[in-house]
């Protein structure tokens, strides 16, 4: 890493590498291609008005499923939970998403990463070793859909 990088640039470089290692295709705007892989992470994604820019918006199979907020190493990640939740609620109209708000939220310095799964009724952020693979998020979305379908089926009997 260049010595003149800012702490935030170093964090983003580490986060890009972690996302890539987990199977995500990391892209900037413009030139976004949601078909570049099962999981695509788009940097600096403009959210709906009054919701700012998500450092990374996560797409699985062409649908928005989560957001990642990047901070420099040493930054207290718990303090930015409201910020990433704002992104999860601020998906621009017209973008495909299986859930609104977006269910999968990450906070990361590139060294420390925290995660919340809003599909869990008792969700909270917790430390994780790495960003999850796109296949894992797909499995969680399918399981949640199956649970809703089974609950509806049981209620209709």
Can you say where each PLM-predicted feature lies in the sequence?
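ATP-dependent helicase/translocase motor core
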Residues: 1-157
């Amino acid at each position: 890493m260049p010595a003149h990088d800012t702490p935030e640039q170093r964090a983003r470089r580490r986060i890009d590498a972690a996302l890539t290692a987990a199977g995500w295709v990391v892209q900037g705007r413009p030139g976004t291609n949601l078909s570049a892989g099962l999981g695509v992470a788009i940097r600096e994604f403009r959210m709906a008005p009054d919701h700012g820019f998500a450092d990374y918006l996560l797409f699985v199979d062409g649908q928005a499923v989560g957001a990642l907020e990047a901070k420099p190493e040493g930054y207290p990640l718990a303090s930015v939970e409201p910020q990433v939740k704002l992104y999860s609620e601020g998906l621009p109209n017209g973008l495909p998403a299986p859930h609104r708000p977006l269910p999968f939220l990450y906070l990361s310095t590139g060294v420390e990463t925290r995660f919340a799964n809003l599909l869990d009724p008792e969700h909270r952020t917790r430390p994780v070793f790495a960003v999850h693979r796109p296949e894992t998020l797909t499995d969680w979305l399918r399981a949640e859909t199956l649970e809703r379908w089974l609950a509806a089926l049981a209620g209709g009997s």
